């Protein structure tokens, strides 16, 4: 009898322990989650974050509020998320490359590998798009204009660290061109500037230019890839390697970033939601297909590895171009 009682007591302790672990693993938010989008409304980060947030609300059982806080190439909103209480209720979003440029440009002392839990959703590509009224019919004509009037062709981007700025800097790296940089508080305003004629061109992402391309307000000359881009409602956009044979760039991964230091059960719960909802989401897939993005959700180590694969070369692109204040190798980013 004594032995049976002891066994029963041990079993009861185990049941209670398992229950406690289960309770700790299941985070149930009791107030809305805020995602700080550190760019303007309507841009690439804003678009995909709103799609993912709507999908996650049901899985997490709470409202998710998107707050746009543009400024200093996204570093202001990102810092606000990083400095917020580590209770799991304040996240941010963006491209992995943003975090690389903040570090080497001295904008924000943050490291993607130590300071953030990364949840990726899509990968984006930049497009060389020109105002439909410009005379440039293909990329070779635009390149000739860059060379015949150095520093005069106007390029709209969302500012330092943005996908558009990375794109034009890559063209500069491979061709030696100079350009006149005109910056805006987000990809959408940059695209609108190109459409209105404030600038001749933009190198923002396909997802930001898609509607204007379909509406024939922007003429796409090349996609920054070694493969053509088939955009729904438009057709094929040729790869930039047709003109710049050795051009290389990787996919620009976008997602949601949760600061390190939040309770483990927050991350465990969001990872389960990402696996069960975002990685199977028809709405995220539809978004990617319609706007020229690649459906590429991941989390954990896989997301960290993917993010670093673009973060690393971008950090060195800025350093080699003389547009960084901090050498990447001094902050643990080896040359690829």
Give, region by region, the residue ranges found by the protein language model.
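Bacterial N-terminal signal peptides that target proteins for export
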Residues: 1-10
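Bacterial N-terminal signal peptides
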Residues: 9-19
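Hinge/capping helix and adjacent helix->loop/strand transition within the periplasmic-binding protein
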Residues: 30, 56-58, 80-90, 102-189, ...
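An extracytoplasmic/periplasmic, membrane-proximal ligand-sensing/linker region
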Residues: 30-32, 267-336
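Short coil/turn segments
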Residues: 42, 96-97, 131-136, 158-162, ...
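A ligand-binding cleft/hinge motif common to bilobed small-molecule-binding domains
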Residues: 96-107, 169-174, 201-237
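C-terminal lobe and pocket-closing loops
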Residues: 209-281, 326-336
């Amino acid at each position: 009898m004594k032995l049976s009682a002891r066994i029963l007591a041990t079993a009861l302790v185990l049941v209670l322990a398992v229950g406690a672990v289960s309770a700790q693993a299941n985070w149930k938010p009791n107030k809305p989650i805020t995602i700080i989008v550190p760019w303007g409304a309507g841009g690439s980060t804003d678009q995909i974050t709103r799609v993912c947030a709507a999908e996650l609300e049901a899985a997490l059982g709470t409202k998710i509020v998107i707050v746009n806080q543009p400024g200093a190439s996204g570093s202001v909103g990102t810092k606000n998320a990083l400095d917020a209480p580590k209770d799991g209720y304040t996240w941010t979003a963006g491209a992995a490359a943003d975090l690389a440029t903040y570090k080497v440009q001295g904008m924000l002392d943050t490291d993607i590998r130590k300071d953030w839990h990364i949840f990726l959703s899509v990968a984006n590509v930049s497009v060389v798009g020109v105002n439909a009224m410009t005379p440039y019919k293909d990329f070779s004509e635009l390149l000739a204009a860059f060379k015949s009037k150095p520093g005069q062709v106007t390029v709209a981007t969302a500012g330092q660290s943005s996908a558009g700025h990375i794109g034009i800097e890559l063209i500069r790296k491979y061709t030696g061109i100079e350009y006149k940089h005109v910056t805006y508080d987000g990809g959408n305003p940059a695209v609108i500037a190109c459409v209105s004629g404030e600038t001749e061109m933009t190198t923002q992402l396909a997802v930001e230019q898609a509607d204007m391309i379909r509406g024939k307000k922007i003429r796409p000359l090349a996609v920054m890839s070694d493969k053509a881009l088939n955009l729904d409602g438009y057709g094929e956009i040729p790869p930039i390697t047709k003109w710049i044979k050795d051009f290389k760039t990787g996919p620009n991964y976008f997602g949601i970033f949760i600061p390190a230091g939040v309770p483990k059960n927050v991350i465990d719960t969001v990872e389960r939601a990402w696996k069960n909802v975002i990685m199977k989401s028809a709405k995220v897939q539809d978004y990617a297909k319609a706007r020229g993005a690649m459906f590429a959700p991941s989390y954990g180590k896989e997301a960290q590895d993917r993010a670093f694969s673009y973060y690393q070369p971008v950090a060195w692109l800025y350093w080699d171009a003389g547009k960084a204040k901090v050498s990447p190798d001094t902050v643990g980013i080896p040359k690829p």
